[in-house]
Amino acid sequence: MPHTLWMVWVLGVIISLSKEESSNQASLSCDRNGICKGSSGSLNSIPSGLTEAVKSLDLSNNRITYISNSDLQRCVNLQALVLTSNGINTIEEDSFSSLGSLEHLDLSYNYLSNLSSSWFKPLSSLTFLNLLGNPYKTLGETSLFSHLTKLQILRVGNMDTFTKIQRKDFAGLTFLEELEIDASDLQSYEPKSLKSIQNVSHLILHMKQHILLLEIFVDVTSSVECLELRDTDLDTFRFSELSTGETNSLIKKFTFRNVKITDESLFQVMKLLNQISGLLELEFDDCTLNGVGNFRASDNDRVIDPGKVETLTIRRLHIPRFYLFYDLSTLYSLTERVKRITVENSKVFLVPCLLSQHLKSLEYLDLSENLIVEEYLKNSACEDAWPSLQTLILRQNHLASLEKTGETLLTLKNLTNVDISKNSFHSMPETCQWPEKMKYLNLSSTRIHSVTGCIPKTLEILDVSNNNLNLFSLNLPQLKELYISRNKLMTLPDASLLPMLLVLKISRNAITTFSKEQLDSFHTLKTLEAGGNNFICSCEFLSFTQEQQALAKVLIDWPANYLCDSPSHVRGQQVQDVRLSVSECHRTALVSGMCCALFLLILLTGVLCHRFHGLWYMKMMWAWLQAKRKPRKAPSRNICYDAFVSYSERDAYWVENLMVQELENFNPPFKLCLHKRDFIPGKWIIDNIIDSIEKSHKTVFVLSENFVKSEWCKYELDFSHFRLFDENNDAAILILLEPIEKKAIPQRFCKLRKIMNTKTYLEWPMDEAQREGFWVNLRAAIKS
């Protein structure tokens, strides 16, 4: 019994492992380029069976806890390995020994509490390494990165347990493009730990407290080009004179991101920035100012010249006591050399006139996503304000009048570029005043319905995209670039109004087509973006777009964004792939050809009808149909005549003087029906023929050469034949007045041929001695 239980347990384990392995394989997908993706697949281990064909492996967001020596042994060509957000707590020493080609390694946000230099020693090609978010306290007992000579981007540290930076941590690293250190809970920093790195393009430093900030600053000031401080509370920061003895600083840009600061500490920070002689750019992103704008220095403090700072950027600045914020006058003197200022989404509603006048070197001002209205803008753009300003961006403020906005900016004599997009202007006056040097105007997303002479004639670039325009008919002789996408235009603008146009972007309008002539009329056009319209793929449009090889050089979004909207059977297809049938593309020629063919067919039919008596056949067919439509007579018909005589008018002498005399004068006499004598006047001839045949016991046909030439004789023969077969009545009697060869009978007398082949006929004898027998036989035939 124990043995059986043991076997069952072993089998269960094997089956479980087999299912797990199968699940791992199913969660991994690889393409032909060796890019394998298995993220968020609930994997418990690295899938087996990985080969040298794998070049990129993404296993992020799984449940992998262990990496063994054999997991990646065969992946000798692996270039990128992403294992972020797993539960990895153990990596065997030689797990990466075969990854000499690996360039990108991401082990962030796992459970690695101890880092080993043996992991990274074989990774001679590594350029990117991310170790963020693992619960290690230090970066190991020995230098981890000394063998990574090609490393360019390094990210280390965590928010909670990484408390110590040692001098050996970054030994061997000489150049990095980006170094990110999450030292949020840093408690110990060994001097010169970061000084060993000779050059860092961008250093990102996460620090909750500022206690060790100055020590780190001393080490990096001569090696870092861009210093970024994140998540730091500088409310109580105090600057102390640095005893470094160094005057050369490499830092060109200093960024404060998600930093807390006060009026007093901001003054202290500025004293720190004074130590950076080469500082050109200062940036504050998502920061909080716990102050009211009181930046006055104490008697013992003095802010020295800010140096060469040219660019100031402030984004999403939060001021809790915004309603008490009152003064910037102490900073006026520090702004005279600044050339570029961006204050975005920070509730700015006014730039004091005095501050504007101090910004003498300002060339670029971006006040996007604020609260500016025309009245306050007029105060900001007062006389002598921003004398060097060339570019003004007031995107997404509260401007409502184009006319007032233009007049307000007249004081800015050097202004050339204005962006007032995403304001709600709705309408545009007929005329406006703008600075004389205006070259660029952005009116996109301003809800305007038309463009007028308010647009300055001096413009070289105009953006009116994402509005409600259905017509553009402005004469702008100097315009080189026109952005008019996402409107309601149905055709390209008139090229004669835009003689200098180089770039036209008119995508996502209501344009259905454009022609070669339209494009050729833009003599200087180099770039056209017209995709996203509902194109009618007519033959002319397709021929133009598919035959013009140079068109692809002009249409920058060709062919992906050019789709057919009609005809319906090609809707959604790319214009370059659509092929229409000959009938769709040459309809006029096809109709003309069909008409010609129909005319020839009618002509040929007429010739054939004339040659083969087709008209005669049609008349006969009509008579036949008329006869078929007549109501069927009852079997016991009202017989009025013994015989109806069908004969040619040229044989009337024989019929009237011989046949009639012989039969009607016989005792008992026969009553014959002759058309000359018995047809009812005023009645249709065909109806007379039909009625006479139906009222006669027999029908006598007097056959001769004259008979076969008579149309009416043919009708009488046809109706008699109809009676013969339709009523099963043997009523036809043939008299051959003169010999007729069957070959001489016309084709239209087909029924006569049939009757002569199936019935005996009486032949008029030339010998008078035999004529008595002829009359006897005829009388007998009529009586039968």
UniProtKB/Swiss-Prot annotation:
<dbReference type="GO" id="GO:0045087">
    <property type="term" value="P:innate immune response"/>
</dbReference>
<feature type="disulfide bond">
    <location>
        <begin position="353"/>
        <end position="382"/>
    </location>
</feature>
<dbReference type="GO" id="GO:0004888">
    <property type="term" value="F:transmembrane signaling receptor activity"/>
</dbReference>
<feature type="repeat" description="LRR 7">
    <location>
        <begin position="200"/>
        <end position="223"/>
    </location>
</feature>
<keyword id="KW-0732">Signal</keyword>
<keyword id="KW-0391">Immunity</keyword>
<feature type="repeat" description="LRR 17">
    <location>
        <begin position="458"/>
        <end position="478"/>
    </location>
</feature>
<feature type="domain" description="TIR">
    <location>
        <begin position="639"/>
        <end position="782"/>
    </location>
</feature>
<keyword id="KW-0325">Glycoprotein</keyword>
<feature type="repeat" description="LRR 18">
    <location>
        <begin position="479"/>
        <end position="500"/>
    </location>
</feature>
<feature type="glycosylation site" description="N-linked (GlcNAc...) asparagine">
    <location>
        <position position="442"/>
    </location>
</feature>
<feature type="repeat" description="LRR 9">
    <location>
        <begin position="251"/>
        <end position="278"/>
    </location>
</feature>
<keyword id="KW-0675">Receptor</keyword>
<feature type="disulfide bond">
    <location>
        <begin position="432"/>
        <end position="454"/>
    </location>
</feature>
<feature type="repeat" description="LRR 13">
    <location>
        <begin position="362"/>
        <end position="388"/>
    </location>
</feature>
<comment type="function">
    <text>Cooperates with LY96 to mediate the innate immune response to bacterial lipoproteins and other microbial cell wall components. Cooperates with TLR1 or TLR6 to mediate the innate immune response to bacterial lipoproteins or lipopeptides. Acts via MYD88 and TRAF6, leading to NF-kappa-B activation, cytokine secretion and the inflammatory response. May also promote apoptosis in response to lipoproteins.</text>
</comment>
<dbReference type="GO" id="GO:0006954">
    <property type="term" value="P:inflammatory response"/>
</dbReference>
<keyword id="KW-0472">Membrane</keyword>
<dbReference type="GO" id="GO:0038023">
    <property type="term" value="F:signaling receptor activity"/>
</dbReference>
<dbReference type="GO" id="GO:0043235">
    <property type="term" value="C:receptor complex"/>
</dbReference>
<keyword id="KW-0395">Inflammatory response</keyword>
<protein>
    <recommendedName>
        <fullName>Toll-like receptor 2</fullName>
    </recommendedName>
</protein>
<feature type="domain" description="LRRCT">
    <location>
        <begin position="525"/>
        <end position="579"/>
    </location>
</feature>
<feature type="signal peptide">
    <location>
        <begin position="1"/>
        <end position="20"/>
    </location>
</feature>
<feature type="repeat" description="LRR 1">
    <location>
        <begin position="54"/>
        <end position="77"/>
    </location>
</feature>
<feature type="repeat" description="LRR 5">
    <location>
        <begin position="151"/>
        <end position="175"/>
    </location>
</feature>
<feature type="repeat" description="LRR 4">
    <location>
        <begin position="126"/>
        <end position="150"/>
    </location>
</feature>
<keyword id="KW-1015">Disulfide bond</keyword>
<dbReference type="InterPro" id="IPR017241">
    <property type="entry name" value="Toll-like_receptor"/>
</dbReference>
<dbReference type="Pfam" id="PF01463">
    <property type="entry name" value="LRRCT"/>
</dbReference>
<dbReference type="InterPro" id="IPR003591">
    <property type="entry name" value="Leu-rich_rpt_typical-subtyp"/>
</dbReference>
<dbReference type="GO" id="GO:0042497">
    <property type="term" value="F:triacyl lipopeptide binding"/>
</dbReference>
<dbReference type="GO" id="GO:0071727">
    <property type="term" value="P:cellular response to triacyl bacterial lipopeptide"/>
</dbReference>
<feature type="glycosylation site" description="N-linked (GlcNAc...) asparagine">
    <location>
        <position position="114"/>
    </location>
</feature>
<comment type="subunit">
    <text>Interacts with LY96, TLR1 and TLR6 (via extracellular domain). TLR2 seems to exist in heterodimers with either TLR1 or TLR6 before stimulation by the ligand. The heterodimers form bigger oligomers in response to their corresponding ligands as well as further heterotypic associations with other receptors such as CD14 and/or CD36. Binds MYD88 (via TIR domain). Interacts with TICAM1. Interacts with CNPY3. Interacts with ATG16L1. Interacts with PPP1R11. Interacts with TICAM2. Interacts with TIRAP.</text>
</comment>
<keyword id="KW-0520">NAD</keyword>
<feature type="repeat" description="LRR 8">
    <location>
        <begin position="224"/>
        <end position="250"/>
    </location>
</feature>
<feature type="transmembrane region" description="Helical">
    <location>
        <begin position="588"/>
        <end position="608"/>
    </location>
</feature>
<dbReference type="GO" id="GO:0030670">
    <property type="term" value="C:phagocytic vesicle membrane"/>
</dbReference>
<dbReference type="GO" id="GO:0002224">
    <property type="term" value="P:toll-like receptor signaling pathway"/>
</dbReference>
<keyword id="KW-1133">Transmembrane helix</keyword>
<feature type="glycosylation site" description="N-linked (GlcNAc...) asparagine">
    <location>
        <position position="199"/>
    </location>
</feature>
